[in-house]
Amino acid sequence: MENKTKEQNALGQDTAQPVVDGKKVLLRLKDVKQYFPVKKTKLREKQRYVRANDGISLDIFEGETLGLVGESGCGKSTLGRTILQLYPQSHGDILYYKDGKGIDLKKLSYEEMRVIRKDLQLIFQDPYSSLNPRMTVGQIIGEGLTSHGVFRRGDPAMKEYIFKVMEDCGLANYMFNRYPHQFSGGQRQRIGIARSLALNPKFVVCDEAGS
């Protein structure tokens, strides 16, 4: 059974955080569709679309791990990026519940979404192209910490914090000043994982992070 206060916003959406069987909903997807237009080859050709995601509705609960299984190209990565608003959905609602109230992610401004990104992180599938080759491990992990105001640049406490995150992700402290090209693919993936977890996010999309 679902229990929730019927607190409605101007759009008629429930803004109070839903609780289902005693579990708090963190993210709620309602009929989410993600269509990409196909380039026309003829002047009067009817617009066609690739339906990457077509009518997805689900709840993701606090503390829950949800796995999406499917063949290559079925839309798993697209759904993850759509939730994070890297691709705003073509249709439907994605609500993120913070401090007990729902936030419609698609309606946020760029700056508002930038604040929320601290809570919603992505571990990229490709550990090679997702790391800046000109930045050291410490700089890569610390970039989000400074841009989101967790630490000031040059703060000695930030280095100690990064060391702790690196240790948690299986990276030795002596790797702090090394560059991505000095690591194997698996080690690079650990760097990407550390970068995301350093912000202590509420939700993480792991795009085949173990591959």
What do these predicted ranges mean?
Residues 27, 51-53:
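Conserved structural motif at the start of ABC-family nucleotide-binding domains
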Residues 69-70:
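The feature captures the beta-strand-to-loop junction immediately N-terminal to the Walker
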Residues 93-115, 154:
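ABC ATPase NBD Q-loop/coupling interface
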Residues 100, 156-174:
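Conserved ABC ATPase "signature" region
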Residues 179-183, 187:
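Conserved ABC ATPase signature
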Residues 193:
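Hydrophobic anchor residue at the start of the ABC signature
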